[in-house]
Design a protein with these regions (language model features):
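C-terminal catalytic domains of large/alpha subunits in multi-subunit enzymes
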Residues: 1-151
Length: 151
């Protein structure tokens, strides 16, 4: 059978700067190109992609859910760091319209596709900057400089 009536395609590329003394990853620029079917409201489509980039940036470099024997330890925004508009990188958005016969008015989904590739793009940019692969999120001091979390 067919799992989905249609598929959303996109490509995301990130540019980062990594401080090799602290492991701090600064996401400088993200370019996202997405086939959105018919962009019924192009401004809202771009807004969704902007939000998805910042959300993916959070997953990749700042947000960390820490748990222990007694449950979740990160219970407030002092320890669970969400990116703000001040943390947002320069963003370049490219919308490609390719009317989808299965989509309402020819549109495709853009909510999840806008977020899904950002972490991988940032991880690949970290690899290009440092020569080290990041396999865990967030990309912090331990994962960037050592390749794993300290126990």
């Amino acid at each position: 059978g067919k799992a989905f009536p249609t598929f959303a395609y996109g490509c995301i590329v990130a540019e980062v700067e990594v401080d090799m003394k602290t492991g701090y990853v600064d996401v400088l620029e993200v370019t996202a190109s997405h086939d959105v079917g018919t962009a019924i409201n192009p401004a809202l489509v771009k807004g969704q992609i902007y939000g998805g980039i910042v959300m993916g940036q959070g997953f990749a470099v700042t947000e960390d859910v820490v748990t222990g024997k007694r449950g979740q330890k990160t219970k407030n925004f002092d320890s669970y760091i969400l990116p703000t508009s001040m943390d947002a990188p320069k963003m370049n958005i490219n919308i490609y319209e390719n009317q989808d016969p299965a989509g309402t008015y020819g549109a495709k989904s853009i909510g999840e596709p806008a977020t899904e590739g950002v972490g991988a793009a940032i991880a690949n940019a970290i690899f290009n900057a440092t020569g080290r692969r990041v396999y865990e999120n967030p990309a912090d001091l331990e994962t960037v400089l050592l390749g794993h979390k300290l126990q």
